[in-house]
């Protein structure tokens, strides 16, 4: 381990010798894309954990934030049940072998910014019957799972996307646990599992399920034969399990959600590494049926990646650009649209995005929750920092946001923090008319 650490330090210094412009705008519908800067190893910097202590994340004036659960076991995504119970999926997955020395080094660097807690492989239920932000009940809702991540409820059927299977459970309203056996709707690609998370959403009418399956590599270096059914979004028939890929070349679709105005499917996507600190921006996009988003042959439409082998100019010619850039290497892992008018005012239509934070650029990016305004079902402005403070003044990480979830009946935003193993709750503290311009508070 000492040798790995020393090698990582030396190569990180080497990779930091070059740079790309740091002031190019990289959010919104038309991000500026600098020239490629491939390197032996990417510039790597991770914010080492320090914990929250007696602090908490920072929210704008007019809002309050509190922890509704602590000491979880790697919380990822969440789901609100019709009675207001909050489900939290907890787990760690992935078992991809390291192919190259830089894979070992990158793995070591990334491990410095993660929790030492073992994943719970469970779904925890939090019941806050009076809505005061302090749950009266916390219990294991479903145990003995295999790295659960995405969840969706259709009627009285609860669907859970594990790293290797989509499962269905019978849900009884008001129940505090499920002990009956699951039904496997369909197996999910799990060989190697370079990107293990399986995001999940249900169509607006509940007839279809959508699962996001990430690639098995950064840019195809394991060979394209192991990328079968990877870097795709599957549409799955809820009753039969029959599935098809509705979008391809979408490197790592880490969260899926239905946009409520148009009922369109949207995703946040983690793009590729090792082309420099300003390439390639992660993004938010509508998932279009039949669209090819470029991976691994191109990015942001038809910008060719020379590292992909074999080259496929025929596919590049069909590649579509995503809708909205979030910034390079922010690691967007959470997506939730507001419904019911949201918080009103500037927060009446749009999406919350949880940005887990970078590991492969010298200036840290992400480590926050942003708000993306929408109008008429489309992004309509620049992203706005909403919940910050995950990086302290000393540059260390207090937490790292993953899933985000807006609970319309209670006008609350929940944030899963998998570094401090906390779920946070953001609510209006005063009228939101003043919240749009106020100074941040902790």
What do the PLM-derived regions correspond to, one by one?
Residues 134-157, 162-203, 215-218, 242:
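Asp-box/WD-like beta-propeller blade repeats and closely related beta-sheet repeat scaffolds
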Residues 67-72, 139-146, 184-192, 245-249, ...:
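Surface loop/turn motifs at the tips and blade-to-blade linkers of beta-strand repeat domains
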Residues 19-59, 97-99, 105, 109-113, ...:
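Beta-propeller domain segments
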Residues 83, 91-92, 163-165, 171, ...:
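Short loop/turn segments immediately following the C-termini of beta-strands
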Residues 85-87, 157-160, 208-212, 264-268, ...:
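Conserved beta-propeller blade signature
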